Amino acid sequence: MKRFIFFLIITSMVQAADKGKPLPPVPADVAGQKAMGAALAESLRGMRLVNEAEIKGNLRIRKPRGKRENVPVTFRAKADGAAQVEIFETAKGTLQIRKTPNKPNEYFFKAPGAKVGKKMEGEQLNQIFAGSDFTLGDLGLEFLQWPNQQVIGRASRLRETCNILLSKPAKVLPGGYSHVKCWVEIHNRALLCVEAYRGGKRVKLFQAKSFKKFEGEWQLRELELRNDVTDARTQIQFDLRAPRK
């Protein structure tokens, strides 16, 4: 079994599918593609950790004019009843995301020095996190919550066969994305690449960059976000030697 982390979130801690089993084709009709897309998005939303997890890493930020910054980050995930709680902690603020089956994600951002977190919703999810190019909604994979999901094809990414999932919101919010394309590895359902668009223009590219075999399993070591509008970059580098709970 492989473990991947997509956007700091461990997705494939469930048993991988049999790679020798024939893959069902992508339907030729739009209705069938939407049904497949809805099922895929639901399965991704429903992934849960078996145990609590803690992973340390760094946000390596390159600003549009070349200035660089390094921000240590700690990712924690734990179960709370049927919900999964994911926490991204930095010296610049802490984001908590509560994911409950069949309910919208809940986001709470606690600024440095604040006693409690502020609930974030709507356009507030476009707020950047810790000076990086990640928004709060990016970290919560908010596009998987959108009502319009469609598998539009199949392609190889990082030498893995992937379904291409097209996600569209019910309404495009100011500063938000008009649609998102993601390449989902078929057997482990790991997101290997994500492209975010405004209108017909791609504005962000999220891509797994390197992996390392750790404790007998392949794990993501580096994820890069490229901002096509500003030419800024943010790399998340994970310390795979960090102890896990």
Model-derived segments and spans:
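Sec-dependent N-terminal signal peptides
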Residues: F4-S12
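Mid-chain, structured segments of secreted extracytoplasmic proteins
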Residues: N70-A111
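Short hydrophobic/aromatic-rich beta-strand segments that constitute the beta-sheet cores
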Residues: I55, A83-I87, N105-K110, K118-K119, ...
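Gly/Pro-enriched, hydrophobic low-complexity segments
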Residues: L158-K245
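A short, Trp-centered hydrophobic/proline-enriched beta-strand micro-motif
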Residues: R48-P64, Q84
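Extended lipid/amphipathic-ligand handling interfaces
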Residues: E42-L44, P72-A77, Q207-K213
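Flexible, processing/modification-adjacent segments and terminal tails
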Residues: D18-E42, R48-L49, K67, P101-S178
